[in-house]
């Protein structure tokens, strides 16, 4: 059996910085090869070399052969247009970079099918494989009308529409709830059995253990381990961080909040949600992709203006963002999942992080920069890395920079929407430890939105479960996770660990029960 792709002594250098140093790996038909490592370890740079692609200012050397074509040699990349899509399809970590915001998803999928494999059945097949409905209503929606997890699956459908021999998946479980993640494992196993070669880039060690035949562990651009799944590092345990609340009165409160995409003529996407966060407390919000978690976060941040009900901060009404005072903006900060688009590609990351302290707290440039560098270092982003433009940072590094940017406002409330999805266990532990310190020392209140039920249980003192925009269950995390009262929560808990039998693919929206109080 011939390999579909072989990478030999691949190196990537940007100026004097070595991004990848003599990396070797092979992709075989019907097998999953995994590249594993911390943010910035060289996973994405190595994978993009299969397409002959690289970041600005990066020089590639070594040998990359794909489908018996030389894509990279010691003189750098060669013409690789013939392998893109037809042989190698790449699904990026951040689906926003793969989706045209001005095109309905159906039109985009049909265009790809026309280029590679004409036929409407190709589009429907790709949607089914990506766990998405193929009805007209779905195909006519724009990318911004889907949740982050749903956009991830749309990007996967785009890659599958091309009918490639090799599928490169960069953090494919990012933003997926536990049920959909388990279904993804089953579908990728089926694709591999059909002969597709899969290159999996992931810090999700459970996903890698469930799928990979070969594992390559990267650290600082070098291969440190290679072999079967036995070479994977042990997971870092996140210790529970729930502390003592400081007061009985909520700091942030949402009362009877409903939201819709349009002012009239559209079913609400959030239905009469109540939420209260105490100083130093943390409310976790969980649910399947598209359940309304991000819409709730955007309402709290003032970004989603089409909502009804009341949102208060320390008992005072909070208007929408454009009507908030600078002090209100400072006190409530929002960090969302897809952060790359929020950074200016022309400016250094540390300067953009520091700007928050200058604008919202009045610090001078020198003090703001020193605080930015110190906060970034606490989160595992070195001063050397932070001095680069955003395009030269990995997804995990940029995610931590976005958190640091919000923290420099010294907020009273921090709304965190999937802020650890691009991080490995060690990076997640750094984030959790710093936020726990802020809760204890400053009384910072957190709203923590995540698909990682174990992490939610570790950081939260109260959990809301959303389904189809409604709170279907709530209570202490120990109770909700161990004695779930609704079928949805039971399915989420059962699916939280990869390797169990997948539950039925039927909609959860019809399994509602009264919320636990």
Residue ranges of predicted features:
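Conserved catalytic motifs of ABC-family nucleotide-binding domains
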Residues: 163, 410
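Helix-to-loop junction immediately C-terminal to a conserved catalytic motif
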Residues: 51, 301
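ABC ATPase "signature
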Residues: 226-227, 474-475
